[in-house]
């Protein structure tokens, strides 16, 4: 009996999730509504490409958005068709990987939030953990080592087709409006699969602090370690550097502070028993600072065909006439 990597039903469920999340068009300029107008055909094309090993993702569309602090963040947006496939794979691997994640991890996880992370910090303070290492990993999403990440994925995911897809997405092409480049390191922010891969990569850090007996709270690449003395904080600091060195990462900022002096984490100010939320801390819609001009998709597909690469999909827009 033939088994399929992803059944049509799985792709249907994935599309509904993509549709609920809204989102803009990718490099092919196909919107969610345009994809849906050829729904059956588009999903069937994806189904065939995936199960005949012809699927190839389109380049990611690199845009720049305002972080709200005067800096810009690059987001790499997959085409709708690729978001569907990534979401379908995510729905397969998420239950497997979520079982492995630690309780100290709050970012990008269903049923977990910034509010819960803040509450956890308060609980540790009330238990006497008043010294804090406040750390932020330098350019985490840009510096993730693909070889190390794939090794970690293989510890839990054994399906070679799924592993192959994840590797394809990690080594994605990126269109920035001028050239197409290939991602050599890092996890592209903006892809459905990226958050769970980020948590998997940093799970080793979570485990190390859990085993040390420290109180540890991590939200994505931003974490704090809570200790009962400055001496304990120094030991935790050393462990932090050792683990990040193994992961080929470095800290951007790192401070040992106390609740008496106060510190800021996840946009919240902690001072002694007080938790202060700045007045202007509101969820703002991220302003797009740069949106690249369209990529010539016909020329791109011709180049792909000439190189022997197939599976970039048929046109997803409604046919005229």
Task: Give the label of every model feature segment.
Residues 81, 85:
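Duplex nucleic acid-engaging cores and interfaces of nucleic-acid transaction enzymes
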Residues 46-64, 68, 100-104, 108-262:
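Conserved polymerase palm-domain catalytic core
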Residues 1-40:
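Non-catalytic, polymerase-adjacent accessory regions of viral genome-replication enzymes
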Residues 73-79:
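Conserved phosphate-binding loops in nucleotide/dinucleotide-binding enzymes
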């Amino acid at each position: 009996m033939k088994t399929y990597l992803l059944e049509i039903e799985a792709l249907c469920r994935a599309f509904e999730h993509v549709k609920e999340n809204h989102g803009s068009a990718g490099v092919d300029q196909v919107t969610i509504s345009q994809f849906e107008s050829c729904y059956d055909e588009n999903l069937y094309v994806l189904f065939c490409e995936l199960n005949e090993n012809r699927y190839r993702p389109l380049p990611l569309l690199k845009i720049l958005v305002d972080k709200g602090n005067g800096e810009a963040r690059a987001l790499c947006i997959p085409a709708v068709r690729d978001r569907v496939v990534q979401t379908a794979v995510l729905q397969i691997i998420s239950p497997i990987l979520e079982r492995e994640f630690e309780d100290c991890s709050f970012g990008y996880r269903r049923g977990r939030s910034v509010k819960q992370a803040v509450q956890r910090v308060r609980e540790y303070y009330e238990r006497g953990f008043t010294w804090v290492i406040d750390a932020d990993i330098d350019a985490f999403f840009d510096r993730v080592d693909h070889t190390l990440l794939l090794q970690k994925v293989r510890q839990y995911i054994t399906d070679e087709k799924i592993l192959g897809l994840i590797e394809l997405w990690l080594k994605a092409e990126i269109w920035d409006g001028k050239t197409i480049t290939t991602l050599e390191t890092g996890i592209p922010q903006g892809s459905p699969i990226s958050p769970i891969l980020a948590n998997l990569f940093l799970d080793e850090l979570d485990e190390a602090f859990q085993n040390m007996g420290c109180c540890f709270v991590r939200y994505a690449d931003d974490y704090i370690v809570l200790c009962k003395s400055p001496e304990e904080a120094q030991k935790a600091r050393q462990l932090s550097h050792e683990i990040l060195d193994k992961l080929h990462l470095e800290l951007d900022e790192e401070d040992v502070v106390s609740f008496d002096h106060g510190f800021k984490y996840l946009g919240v100010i902690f001072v002694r028993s007080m938790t202060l939320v700045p007045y202007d801390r509101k969820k703002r819609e991220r302003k797009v600072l740069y949106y690249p001009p369209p990529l010539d998709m016909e020329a791109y597909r011709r180049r792909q065909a000439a190189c022997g690469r197939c599976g970039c999909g048929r046109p997803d827009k409604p046919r005229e006439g």
